[in-house]
């Protein structure tokens, strides 16, 4: 049958099972929005307050559901406003399809009104992108975009469509999408055998889990693997929830703000088994001193990650779930009682601690965990609150912790929380924000209110850019340049003006009461939590130092006294 390009866009989305699109209309994309209007019962459109909010919402939807997130934007500034969200998704391997519309084909390259080379701009931050200048190729291009976004290591794909292509007609035939196949043809049985041999030979193995394990859906296989290897397990920020954070074998996060147990344990192990990690600088610290006593065995779907940031001794390339299935089949149960005993001693010696009186970031995370029984979807912005959320909330399941890890995008959380809440209507979604981050995209409170989303926005408000100030305090001789936010902005009134409920709390009891009411609310709730401006994230590894040298505030005080 003959359809316009705009009709083809909508039909292709329906083919792919898309039920929600986040976006903002404009002149170039009007034909697509006009067609979307006719399919309101099949595809929900969420009008965000800003295109960046739409891209973050698509990201949060994708991370929390495992499905592709979709966002729309018009030409020019509409498209460029997506860029930060696309880059965020790219750095964290999130399957997002961004559909933009441009000026008509005859106007391309002529500096036309709202013309922008969005394909060129996003080339370094997309897994692939397309500009469609022939309507006969539109349907297959959109189908390819969805396949590329999900296959192997996921990532964002952009499809840019000139406006005249959305009006042009061509023949369209519906196609049933094929299931996305797991990457198994790259798994070499010889490599699997080598991995099994290394594990059997190890006396002090340690399992290090990243976001790849979440993406692959390998949690059950990972649990079996950890039990068979009889090894402690640490994770990255992106790996939260892949392995049960309440399990006795779990030792917490590794790296700059990792636990002392994980940092010391990895520094002492003789085999580090990396499952879906990219060995970022935030984890490695001084790369030359990282896991210096260990052989490193890496499992990853992306061959480009092998030996990229650190040299490994062996690797298995392919889908992590399938790799773990094959290794588990060939691996007998191992036993390392002395090693496990050493790790348990470290856990007892170096627990995460904080002052129990007063309102603080760690207290808020522990109380949120207690009140939600660990069953919420936690979203964060970027900064101190992000680290506290990673440290003190125990994640039992994958896709329950959403955060911008690779790019570190302030302003990510609220949009992502909207996407997560829409993708998971039966779950409680909570965005943890700093007062600096909240200012970035606080306009999306209006979106949450309009959509009647019962998400909770918890602002950890210290009236400073906390993480930047922490570095200024520790490494810049307390020169607090441009990090004080003492302008008296009333976040509660802002929330109420946008249709949400707002509370300001200054004590533990006030927070408990406000959070209890928030959990019972059917509309978004903002809780502005006033904490000490001088609170810091501990432990910490100084830049350029080995992760084994992580220190706390107490360590620093003792050093200064000596």
Where are these regions (language model features)?
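N-terminal alpha/beta PP-like core and its mobile active-site loop of ThDP/TPP-dependent enzymes
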Residues: 1-331, 371-374, 454-459, 474-477, ...
């Amino acid at each position: 049958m003959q359809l316009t390009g705009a009709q083809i866009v909508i039909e292709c989305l329906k083919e792919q099972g898309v039920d929600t699109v986040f976006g903002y209309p404009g002149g170039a994309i009007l034909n697509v929005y006009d067609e979307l209007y006719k399919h309101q019962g099949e595809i929900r459109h969420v009008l965000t307050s800003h295109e960046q909010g739409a891209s973050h919402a698509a990201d949060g939807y994708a991370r929390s559901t495992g499905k592709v997130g979709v966002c729309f934007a018009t030409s020019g500034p509409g498209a460029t406003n997506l860029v930060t969200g696309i880059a965020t998704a790219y750095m964290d391997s999130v399957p997002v399809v961004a559909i933009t519309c441009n000026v008509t084909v005859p106007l391309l390259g002529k500096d036309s009104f709202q013309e922008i080379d969005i394909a060129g701009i996003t080339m370094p931050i997309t897994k692939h992108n397309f500009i469609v200048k022939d309507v006969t190729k539109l349907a297959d291009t959109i189908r390819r975009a969805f396949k590329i976004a999900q296959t192997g290591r996921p990532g964002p794909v952009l499809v840019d469509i000139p406006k005249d292509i959305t009006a042009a007609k061509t023949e369209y035939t519906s196609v049933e999408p094929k299931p996305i196949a797991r990457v198994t043809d790259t798994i070499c049985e010889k490599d699997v055998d080598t991995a099994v041999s290394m594990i059997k030979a190890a006396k002090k193995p340690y399992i290090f889990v990243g976001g790849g394990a979440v993406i692959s859906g390998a949690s059950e296989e990972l649990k079996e693997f950890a039990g068979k290897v009889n090894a402690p397990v640490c994770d990255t920020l992106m790996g939260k929830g892949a392995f049960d954070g309440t399990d006795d074998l779990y030792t917490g996060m590794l790296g700059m703000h990792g636990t002392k147990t994980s940092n010391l344990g990895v520094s002492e192990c003789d085999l580090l088994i990396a499952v879906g990690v990219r060995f970022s600088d935030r984890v490695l610290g001084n790369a030359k001193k990282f896991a210096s006593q260990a052989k490193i065995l890496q499992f990853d779907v992306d061959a480009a990650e092998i030996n990229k940031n650190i040299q490994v001794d062996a690797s298995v390339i392919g889908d992590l779930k399938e790799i773990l299935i094959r290794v588990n089949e060939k691996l007998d149960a191992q036993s390392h009682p002395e090693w496990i005993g050493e790790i348990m001693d470290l856990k007892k010696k170096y627990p995460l601690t904080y002052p129990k009186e007063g309102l603080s970031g760690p207290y808020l995370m522990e109380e949120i965990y207690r009140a939600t029984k660990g069953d919420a979807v936690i979203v964060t912005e970027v900064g101190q609150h992000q680290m506290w959320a990673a440290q003190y909330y125990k994640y039992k399941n994958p896709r329950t912790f959403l955060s911008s890890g690779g790019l570190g995008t302030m302003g990510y959380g609220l949009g992502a929380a909207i996407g997560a809440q829409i993708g998971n209507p039966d779950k409680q979604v909570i965005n943890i924000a700093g007062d600096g981050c909240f200012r970035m995209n606080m306009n999306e409170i209006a979106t949450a209110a309009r959509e009647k989303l019962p998400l909770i926005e918890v602002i950890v408000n210290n009236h400073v850019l906390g993480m930047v100030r922490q570095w200024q305090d520790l490494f810049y001789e307390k020169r607090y340049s441009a990090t004080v936010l003492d302008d008296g902005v009333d976040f509660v009134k802002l929330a109420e003006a946008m249709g949400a409920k707002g509370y300001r709390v200054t004590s533990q009891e006030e927070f408990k009461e406000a959070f209890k009411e928030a959990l019972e609310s059917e509309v978004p709730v903002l809780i502005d939590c006033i904490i000490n401006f001088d609170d810091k994230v501990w432990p910490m590894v100084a830049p350029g130092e080995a992760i084994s040298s992580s220190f706390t505030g107490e360590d620093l005080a003792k050093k200064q006294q000596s």
